[in-house]
Amino acid sequence: MSTPAAGREEVSRAAEPSRSRWTALAFIAVAQLMIALDATIVSIALPSAQAALGASDADRQWVVTAYTLSFGGLLLLGGRIADFAGRKRAFLLGLAGFAVASMIGGAAPSFAVLVVARALQGAFAALLAPTALSLLAVTFTQPRERATAFAVYGSIAGSGAAIGLLLGGVLTQYLTWRWCLYVNLPVAIVAAVGGWIVLPGSGARVRARLDLPGVALATAGLVALVYACTEAVSSGWSSATVIGLLTTSFVTLALFVFREARTAHPLLPLRILADRNRGGAYIVVALVIAGMFGAFLFLTYYLQTVLHYTPLQAGLAFLPLSVASQAGSWLIASSLMPHVAPRALMAPGALVAAAGMALLTQLQPAGAYLLLVLPAEVLLGLGISCVMVPAFSTATQRVDPRESGVASATVNAASQVGGSLGTALLNTVAVSAAAGFAGAQAAAFVHGFSVATAWGAVILVLAALVATVLISAGRPQPHRPI
């Protein structure tokens, strides 16, 4: 049994400067980069995988959908497992499972095996993603150190998708689509070996029963919501399937909240959501991802379908966004976070990103990469990084360390739901606008893209408004390290 003196000794050790914490940050970042890359790297390889495995056009979406459903649906469970089992154990288990799933997918002899492997990847990503963020939240508690650590995390979140497109293009064009999955193996091994050596012990763990009814309700509600958004892209929001899924999601999530408010050992303690600053950060993350993700997808299609870029060229075309995201994370967010209130970064950042979206509304079928796409990517990269770095920090700040896993899972779930909703909503807007446009196919597509991007800009402005109104936290103050 631990004593108060032992507890003080543990805190004292944690407060001592330790190089191993920064080494640990490097391996946590490697793991997070693997997850971020996987969001887009397989999308580039999908046409080649479809042809090689003989999948139909109707079935190919399941390579993406299987990952999205398991990732989004299991995040809260994954975060709570980290709290129960310990962060180091959960981190290593997530890496091992993700690597095995990637190996199965890379060697898949059939399309069905590939889909199952992608579902397994999503399940282990749902364990790994909140665990990685939780490790950052409890390891780096002083304002300057926290700003640096979350700048690393934010730069990966902002540029990982773009890097995934580039890497996917290189691997598909010069090797084979299977390497878009195999590439995770060496990355996971490096992160796992490093994590095993330098990560601290699992620390305080929750000594309580797992809320199995809460797990079932949360998983069913999130899966139904994410699947409804996915299905709406092809079937429309008025289809019976989508309406049924949305109804199921609403009912099960309402029952989940009812359950969590009354059980002694909730899966998601509602006090985590009730905090004004954390709740505001969750909403901002969801809105920013919703506004950005749909337009990000459309821009990929624009470059390859309208401008006829190869997958590799399209990946290279996204490099400015990645560079700008790194610059925004390190030169702006990391420097200013210890000195200003979170909303002083988040609101202007969202407005800068909205300006980048507004530029994209001016695209033409003839193309204007240097005049429009390039500056838009720079604005998007700078703006998004200045939102995400303080948002992720605020969403996990001052949380009981025994609940840091589920708190980290909640902000990841907000990101996942935001991406799914944004893609579905903006796709609906784009299709409707293109259908009502009298002109050539390319012109109609670009018109639909422009209208959808305008809506994306509006969503980003709304994110700036939410950050200004809801997030009232002041300048970061030092607090006791965990």
Tell me what each language-model feature is.
Residues 14-15, 190-219, 261-276, 337-338, ...:
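Flexible interhelical linker loops that connect adjacent transmembrane helices
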Residues 141-143, 201-206, 229-243:
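Alpha-helical transmembrane bundle and helix-membrane interface signal
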Residues 2-197, 331, 336-340, 346, ...:
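Transmembrane-helix bundle of Major Facilitator Superfamily
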